[in-house]
Amino acid sequence: MMVAKYVKRMMGGAIASIVVLGGAMAAAPAHADVGDGLKVARSNACMGCHAVDRKLVGPSFQQIAERYKSDQQAVPKLAKKVKDGGSGVWGAIPMPAHPRMSDADVRSVVQWVLAGAPSK
């Protein structure tokens, strides 16, 4: 009888743990990698102002990569620019903020841009 009670309590704890961990895993943001940079850029309207190899409203991704190629702090600088927006670096037109982009998606796009915005 006592063993059955112990097993029942252990099973209840195990099930509760699975539910809690499962919920935490479902709530965790998906982690994009640099290979997803182009896909993430397209799905977050980046291509409305930027192109890979030519200036549109904003600089081309290749121009950005060239400007920041020797900057050791390029990833955090550009990630902040994507999240918070900014102006004056590439002209008078401001970069709009993208606060709803996940940190993983921002990092993916920034790393992809700094890699020269490859098409694959």
Give a label for each model feature.
Residues 1-9:
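N-terminal secretory signal peptides that target proteins for export/translocation
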Residues 12-13, 17-29:
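C-terminal segment of classical bacterial N-terminal signal peptides
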Residues 44-52, 109:
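The canonical Cys-X-X-Cys-His
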Residues 67-77:
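Short microdomains enriched in Cys/His and/or Lys/Arg
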